[in-house]
Amino acid sequence: MDLKEACGSEASRETESGGMGSLGGHSSWQSFAHRSTLHGLRFIFPYSSSSSSSSSYRSTSRRLLWSAALLASLVLLVLESTERLAYFLSYPHVTSVDAVVSGSLVFPAVTVCNLNAYRFTRLTQNDLYHAGELLALLDVHLQIPEPHLAEPHVLAFLTEKSNFTNYRPKPFSMREFTERVGHDLKEMMLYCRFQGQECSHQDFKTVFTRYGKCYMFNAAEEGKTLRTTMKGGTGNGLEIMLDIQQDEYLPVWGETEETAFEAGVRVQIHSQAEPPFVHELGFGVAPGFQTFVATQEQRLTYLPPPWGECVSRALDSGLFQVYSVSACRIECETRYIVENCNCRMVYMPGDSPYCTPEQYKDCAEPALAALSAVEGTNCICRSPCNMTRYNKELSMVKIPSKTSARYLEKKFNRSEKYITDNILVLDVFFEALNYETIEQKKAYEVAGLLGDIGGQMGLFIGASILTLLELFDYAYEVVKERLLDLLNREEEEESHGEDVSTCDPVVNHSESISHTVSVPLQTTLGTLEEIAC
């Protein structure tokens, strides 16, 4: 056997045995397993300080049992941790409901719309010329379409106003027409009280909706404070008596968007921060009845994605300062009509020109109907993250009673039949002086996830975060030791090559002596350099 190879293999064995960092003949992994806080690891890789340890400590069957137990615990830990992580990534939420007693509450905005948008007797000849076909009062030839269905006084009025011989039409605006011909609250309102104090039509703000000209009580206006209420129950809210003026309703000879088959008013109770959306969110109040509306304020808080689907930012169009579902719907309708018809309807915000009656009939109303059919895809309006809603409970009684009919006839100079057909009373009040909070909360957060996984680690393998740090620290030390060992080997190989080259003549001399028989075969070995040389 060549002396160089023997010396090289011996040196490598010495390096390997020293590189493991063993103590007392044990591997570094056994030492780590003995010191580790990971339960069961020291029984799988036993470590004993003396060679006379009991055989049961190193029993193969015992090690296999501990290995199976640790493996099963690791599998259960992975399964449970995966389930907890999947639950966390589903972003669950819970909803909490609470009732809060308050000393006072801001009274909601109350929007009232007559179901008839335009007063018949306020129509002018110019109105009929431009909007007669839109209102279904005249046909495309500006003629009365169904004269046999009209009452005598209605037919006489239309016959007079629809004579357009030598008529020169004047400019026409749908906004001005709606403002002028819509029902006037000053004429409709017979009395008004808020918390027992008298109020008037001046306490209402004019707004425009799909029903035309409407009126909002307790609107948010600059320079005015919102009304509050200190008590709940009837008499501590808004009470108004209205005359719906059925004599002014447009005659119905066909189905159009501008004519109504019902009689009464449409009412919406809403927050001052959101615009009225009466045609969808309002409720009807019929004449001949006093309607009591007991309401309760609800303050809702929703979570943003990924836990929920609420929206907190304002609309990009800038038409409304505060985001709400109603504002989003109106903004969507406005954008759709402007894009398709190059105009906007009277109730729509913005600076685009108002649609003409022809654009209303030929474009805006059909486009709005088409949008409503596919609104789920074109108008996606999510709930705001914070909103105020009002629950309502309605009840009603008939008016007038037989005993009060004479008095009301005398007071309002109207017959009992007129009162039954036209007069209504609306009473809006808080059911109690408290509000309800409905709040979405995160059901599972990072702290809960870490707590669950930490609990599973402690239960199954008796580990903690520090145990994981132990594993990482051991892996770091092993990698570092291997790298240092590799570098030392390279340096030794380089230095070994240099030493061999310096003793080449001696090698030749030894080779010449090796042929001498008198050289003993068993020579005492010297240092590594002597052997190599």
Curated annotation (Swiss-Prot):
Inhibited by the diuretic drug amiloride. InterPro entries: ENaC, ENaC_chordates, ENaC_CS. Can form homotrimers; probably non-functional. Heterotrimer; could form functional heterotrimers producing channel with specific properties depending on their composition. It comes from Danio rerio (Zebrafish). A motif (GAS motif) lies at residues 462-464. Disulfide bonds join C113-C214, C310-C385, C328-C381, C332-C379, C341-C363, C343-C355. This is Acid-sensing ion channel 2. The keyword Ribonucleoprotein does not apply. The lineage of its organism: Eukaryota, Metazoa, Chordata, Craniata, Vertebrata. Residues 1-16 have a biased composition (Basic and acidic residues). It comes from the Eukaryota. Residues 90-445 are extracellular. The chain crosses the membrane at residues 69-89, 446-466. Keywords: Cell membrane, Disulfide bond, Glycoprotein, Ion channel, Ion transport, Membrane, Sodium, Sodium channel, Sodium transport, Transmembrane, Transmembrane helix, Transport. Belongs to the amiloride-sensitive sodium channel (TC 1.A.6) family. ASIC2 subfamily. It is found in: Cell membrane.
